[in-house]
Regions:
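A glycine-rich helix N-cap at a beta->alpha junction
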Residues: 58-73
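Conserved acidic residues
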Residues: 2, 33, 67, 98-99
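Generic structural signal for well-ordered secondary structure
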Residues: 50-54, 62, 81, 85
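Active-site cores that bind ATP or allylic diphosphates and position pyrophosphate for catalysis
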Residues: 71-393
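Acidic, Ser/Thr-rich peripheral helices and adjacent loops at domain boundaries
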Residues: 56-59, 124-125
Length: 393
C-alpha cells in the first residue's frame, strides 16, 4: 500500500491543495494511494490563529481527497521552518505507514533543492549576518549561498533561498534525509494564483455575516465541498472567524502585566524589548520578521517557555483529526506499526499521563492553545474533549 504524506495547514483548503493531491497520486502511479496529511491545529506556522477550527479544516480536506488527517502539535506547528518541518516529517515517519512525501514548490528548478539539502550554512557568515541585524531567514540564506559550491546559477540559488515556501521544502528534504525515512520525495510546482493567502484576502473583503458574500468571494478558488463545509459551519454558528484584533489587544495587556518576557520561546535577541515597546502599535521592523514576532506572542499567550522548545525535539503522540473509509483501513494498519501512541480522542491522552510526562506536557500545551483559539472564535472552552475524529464516506 502506498501512503503519500503531505504537510499542510489548509488555512483554508483551496484548489491548489486539491491539485497537489491529484498530482501526487499521478506521480506515485497509484490512483488508489492513501493520502495522509499532518496539519496545523489552532495556530499556524507563521504564528497566527487559523482562519477556522482544525476539525472544520480537516473535514474540508477529507472531502477533497485526503484520507487521514493528523494534527501537528502546537510546539511544532507554530515554529520556525526547521522545527516545523522536522516535527511534521518525523510524525509522518513514526506512523510507520508513509511511503512517499509530496509537497509544493515555487522555485524554477526544484532539483536545486535536493542539491541544497546537503549544504550546511557557513557558520561565520551566519553569525556576521545576524550581528549586522539581518533576520534569521535572511542570514541563513546568505550563509547557505556562501557555503554552496555546486554548478547551479548563483542567481537561481539566491532566488530559491529567499522564497519562504522553498525554504520549507528544503527543510522537509533535510529532515527526511537526516531521519533516513526512506520516503520517495515528490516536488510539485505550485499553480500561480492559488494560495491560502489569496483566499484569506478574499475572505477579509467579504461581509462575514453574509454567507452569499463569502461564497461569491471564494467560489472557484476553494473546491465546492470544502467551501460548503466552511459555509455550513459558519451558518450553524459552530465558530466565528477568529478575531485577530481582540487577540492582539489581549496580548498587549499580558505584556503590560508580565515583568519578564525573556523566558518565553522566541523572545531572544532583544525581541522581548521590541514587543514590550511596540505591542500596541506598529510591529513591522527590518530586524525581526512578522512570523517570528507572532510566534513569540503565541508562545507568551500559551506559556510556552524557551527551555521547553530547546529540550523537546519530538512529537509524543499521533492525534487523529479524521479519516475516510480508505483512511480507516490505513489507521488499522497504523495501530500495529506506529512508533507513537495514537490518540483518537483527547481522553486517550489521560491514560498515558502517569507513564509519559513528556506526552502530558506536550498535550496540555495543545489543550491550552485550543482553548485560546476558542476564546477568539466564539467556541466553547474545552471543546477538544468533545471532539471525535471527523469521519467521511
Amino acid at each position: 500500500m502506498r501512503v503519500i504524506g503531505i504537510i499542510a495547514e489548509y488555512n483554508p483548503f483551496h484548489a491548489g491543495h486539491e491539485y497537489l493531491i491529484s498530482e501526487a497520486k499521478r506521480l506515485v502511479g497509484d490512483p488508489r494511494a492513501v493520502v495522509m496529511t499532518v496539519m496545523s491545529g489552532p495556530f499556524v506556522q507563521r504564528g497566527s490563529l487559523a482562519v477556522s477550527p482544525k476539525h472544520v479544516r480537516a473535514k474540508e480536506a477529507l472531502l477533497s481527497g485526503v484520507d487521514v488527517a493528523i494534527e501537528l502539535p502546537f510546539t511544532f506547528a507554530c515554529a520556525p521552518s526547521e522545527r516545523f518541518a522536522s516535527g511534521a516529517v518525523e510524525l509522518l515517519y513514526r506512523t510507520g505507514v508513509v511511503t512517499d512525501l509530496a509537497f509544493g514548490v515555487d522555485c524554477k528548478d526544484p532539483s536545486i533543492l535536493m542539491e541544497l539539502a546537503d549544504v550546511n550554512p557557513d557558520e561565520e557568515v551566519l553569525k556576521t549576518a545576524l550581528s549586522n541585524g539581518r533576520s534569521f531567514p535572511a542570514a541563513r540564506a546568505e550563509a547557505m549561498i556562501s557555503a554552496y559550491s555546486g554548478g547551479a546559477d548563483p542567481e537561481l540559488v539566491s532566488d530559491t533561498l529567499r522564497q519562504p515556501n522553498s525554504i520549507l521544502a528544503l527543510d522537509y528534504i533535510k529532515a527526511a534525509k537526516k531521519m533516513n525515512t526512506g520516503f520517495k520525495i515528490h516536488m510539485i510546482p505550485r499553480k500561480e494564483g492559488l494560495s491560502a493567502t489569496s483566499v484569506r484576502e478574499e475572505l477579509n473583503k467579504a461581509d462575514r455575516t453574509s454567507m452569499s458574500s463569502i461564497a461569491d468571494r471564494l467560489n472557484g478558488i476553494m473546491p465546492d465541498k470544502a467551501l460548503s463545509v466552511m459555509l455550513s459551519s459558519i451558518s450553524r454558528k459552530e465558530f466565528l472567524i477568529p478575531d485577530e484584533s481582540s487577540y492582539m489587544n489581549d496580548a498587549a495587556l499580558m505584556v503590560r502585566r508580565e515583568q519578564d518576557l525573556t523566558g518565553y520561546a522566541y523572545m531572544s535577541d532583544g525581541l522581548d524589548g521590541f514587543i514590550r515597546n511596540n505591542i500596541g502599535g506598529d510591529l513591522q521592523t527590518k530586524h525581526f520578521t512578522m512570523p517570528r514576532i507572532r510566534r513569540a506572542i503565541a508562545s507568551m499567550m500559551t506559556g510556552q517557555r524557551a527551555s521547553y522548545v530547546e529540550q523537546e525535539k519530538h512529537a509524543q503522540y499521533i492525534r487523529v483529526l479524521g479519516f475516510s473509509n480508505e483512511g480507516k483501513y490505513c489507521l488499522k494498519i497504523m495501530g500495529k506499526c506506529a512508533r507513537l501512541p495514537i490518540l483518537s480522542n483527547a481522553s486517550d491522552a489521560l491514560e498515558l499521563y502517569s507513564s509519559n510526562p513528556r506526552l502530558k506536557a506536550q498535550f496540555e500545551l495543545d489543550l491550552l492553545a485550543n482553548d485560546i483559539y476558542a476564546s477568539y472564535a466564539s467556541m466553547e472552552q474545552g471543546y477538544e474533549w468533545k471532539l471525535p475524529p471527523v469521519k467521511v464516506k
